[in-house]
Amino acid sequence: MLVHPQFDPVAIAVGPVAVRWYGLMYLLAFVLFVVLGRAHARRRPELGWNAQAIDDLLLYGVLGVIIGGRLGEVLFYQPGYYLSHPAEILAVWKGGMSFHGGFLGVLVAMWLYGQRSGRGFWQITDFIAPLVPTGLAAGRIGNFINGELWGRPASPDLPWAMIFPWVDALPRHPSQLYQAAGEGLLLFAIVWVFAAKPRPLRAVSAVFLIGYGSLRFVAEFFRTPDPGIFSDLVPGLSTAQWLCVPMVVVGLALLKHAAHARARG
């Protein structure tokens, strides 16, 4: 049975300046976005993206992720706590970022970028969809290093079951790593390959929505659920699972629309 290594959350400390692993994982996510974005632009030159446009996308995306992710954590998961401690809302370095909030923040940011650049919203989301999952993987690895978002109790016979000593002595699923592998690496492989060929408008975005929503919904059964505003709607389903449902529904609707558009030619 494995035991969590209890990493020091600070990766580098020089005097009073400390760089945390969680921040480095965000930096890695942003670097991967640029590297993959340029590779995607090279393999699909007809899409009309260049290095400057990708850098602009990153700037808008970073703002959307940070602002939306934090607001999502505040509104979806801990509204009572943050109403009592409003100064903590700005303490993003302590963790506490909601994917679904960050996702909505990025959508708003991409719409704003589209207004400035003259590009269509779905043209933008279809381009960035293959670039996002590796960043999600990096974020989940950051969660694992931080020792947060641990899994539900697991059978002691499970070879990779892990004890998180600061929680209890029970073997648990390392759900952060499940999510890094699933909604990170597996989803990246699916969307990256799908986006390699010309697709109808909205189709790549649809595959991302369906893939992420489905994989996250399943992963939540292995992760200790976070208390949230939808936690009590149906026993056994978490707030994150409820937030994944509209992602899948919208994704299916977009895929159907894209298929009809292709059929009409």
Curated annotation (Swiss-Prot):
Cellular component, GO annotation: plasma membrane
The keyword Membrane is annotated on this UniProt entry: yes
GO molecular function: phosphatidylglycerol-prolipoprotein diacylglyceryl transferase activity
Transmembrane segments: 17-37, 57-77, 89-109, 127-147, 176-196, 201-218, 233-253
Predominant localisation class: membrane
Top-rank lineage group of the source organism: Bacteria
Entry keyword ATP-binding: no
Pathway annotation: Protein modification; lipoprotein biosynthesis (diacylglyceryl transfer)
Membrane topology: Multi-pass membrane protein
Positions bound to a 1,2-diacyl-sn-glycero-3-phospho-(1'-sn-glycerol): 140
Biological process, per Gene Ontology: lipoprotein biosynthetic process
Enzyme Commission number(s): 2.5.1.145
InterPro entries tied to this protein: Lgt
Compartments where located: Cell inner membrane
One family name in Pfam for this protein: LGT
Protein role: Catalyzes the transfer of the diacylglyceryl group from phosphatidylglycerol to the sulfhydryl group of the N-terminal cysteine of a prolipoprotein, the first step in the formation of mature lipoproteins.
Family: Belongs to the Lgt family.
Record's protein name: Phosphatidylglycerol--prolipoprotein diacylglyceryl transferase
Species this protein is from: Azoarcus sp. (strain BH72)
